[in-house]
A protein has these predicted regions:
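Short active-site loop at a secondary-structure junction
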Residues: 33-43, 63-124, 161-173, 245-248
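Structural recognition of the beta-strand scaffold that forms the well-ordered cores
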Residues: 41-43, 51-53, 76, 124-126, ...
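Short, surface-exposed loop or secondary-structure junction motifs
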Residues: 115-324
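Short, surface-exposed beta-strand/loop micro-motifs that present aromatic residues
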Residues: 249, 325-326, 332-345
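Generic C-terminus detector
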Residues: 354-379
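Short, conserved catalytic-motif segment at the N-terminal edge
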Residues: 17-75, 98-100, 235, 357-362
């Protein structure tokens, strides 16, 4: 297992305000003890270094299954796909002038010009203000024969409210964004992202549709006929689309997600200082694009990213991250939060979706996420 990477300095910081196991171990292990997830990988750091990295528990509830390692254990990132692959691919295309944020989506996907959708822009999709419904219900998905039928259904959607009116967090927005990437770049999202983003960033453990040969080190997210299912995307829409979709399908290790977080903290710069994306383009994507309506419980949004306040009673971002913080979570049990004012990121990957023992595993995980974010903020402030 990868050794902990600790950056401890002399001083008077309290034990609860340090980047070490004394701070983080009880929080992550509590989630395992409560049955929210069988294992987890946590990485905390800054734009130029990792401050803490550790794996907890096992890939399944069996103690005989492999232990989690923050470098080699891969997780189904679920909706973290939206920000790591889809949003950032759009950021690259916008930066190059290939895609315009305020252009209608129909400029890139001509079929998306039905009643109500012709006025939806790329910015609307990224901010989740398109007015499209949240997703396709399971029964509706099952009735669709194949990926082509699913895309035709999405292309034929009618907004529930006029574009730009309010935030409706929607997988359909991300599916359409993946289609925009494919049409604008003339290649599938996974191919474009692998060459233009993952390779330059050195994300060697980040990919769609992981090969069978590495499935033994992928955290499972389901059970089929008594066997753990690993390496197959958990999201039903992404599965129907063949494992590559703008809303889900990406697999990665925690340290790769950390490298991506560092790229965002560097405002689009590679480790050697070269700009993969211009800083002004990154800043445009991180501006607050939509605020929650009072009383709706919806979250604030940047372009592609969740922002603070999150609109949650129990926030996955905790209570201490700065006002410019941005992040995202994934249904399978993944999360990433970045605080540019503190030069701080927190990556927590779990496989909560795998046979959780807790009755309310999602709520339990949100509590753990928030506590870890707050602990990281306190540790950062104490230095």
């Amino acid at each position: 297992m990868l050794a902990l990477v600790l950056l401890l300095q002399t001083g008077v910081a309290q034990p609860t305000a340090r980047f070490d196991g004394g701070t983080f171990d009880p929080l992550v292990e509590r989630g395992i003890l409560e049955g929210a997830y069988p294992g987890a990988a946590l990485v905390v750091g800054r734009r130029d270094r990792v401050l803490f990295a550790h794996g907890y528990g096992h890939l399944t509830w069996s103690a005989s299954s492999p232990r989690v390692d923050p470098e080699s254990t891969l997780y189904d990132l679920a909706s973290l796909t939206k920000v790591i692959a889809t949003t950032t691919s759009l950021m690259l295309l916008v930066d190059r002038g290939t895609v315009q944020l305020d252009a209608p989506v129909a400029a890139y996907v001509p079929e998306f010009d039905g009643p109500g959708t012709a006025g939806i822009t790329v910015r609307h999709l990224l901010a989740h203000t398109s007015g499209l419904r949240a997703d396709l219900p399971d029964a509706e998905l099952k009735a669709l024969r194949d990926s082509g039928a699913l895309m035709r259904r999405v292309l034929g959607e009618t907004p529930r409210v006029p574009p730009g009116r309010r935030v409706i967090y929607s997988d359909l927005n991300a599916i359409m964004l993946g289609e925009v990437v494919q049409r604008a770049s003339s290649e599938p999202l996974d191919v474009f992202a692998a060459r233009e983003l993952f390779a330059p960033l050195g994300l060697r453990e980040t990919r769609f549709r992981p090969p069978i040969r590495i499935r033994a080190r992928i955290a499972p997210t389901g059970v089929w006929r008594g066997h753990a299912v690993a390496g197959v995307v958990n999201d039903a829409s992404a599965f129907k689309l063949g494992g590559v979709s703008g809303n889900a399908g990406l697999f990665a290790g925690a340290l790769d997600v950390a490298r991506f977080a560092q790229f965002m903290l560097r405002e689009g710069a590679l480790p050697d200082g070269r700009q993969l994306v211009r800083a002004e383009t990154v800043r445009e994507f991180l501006k607050r694009a939509a605020a929650p309506e009072r009383g709706t419980g919806a979250e604030a949004r940047a372009l592609g990213w969740q922002a603070v306040p999150t609109g949650e009673t129990v926030s996955s971002a905790g209570t201490l991250l700065g006002p410019r913080s941005f992040g995202h979570t994934g249904w399978t049990g993944t999360s990433l939060w970045i605080d540019p004012d503190r030069n701080l990121f927190v990556v927590l990957l779990t496989n909560r979706a795998f046979a959780p023992r807790a009755r309310r595993s999602f709520t339990a995980l949100k509590t753990v996420r928030g506590q870890i974010a707050d602990a990281a903020a306190r540790a950062s402030d104490a230095r």
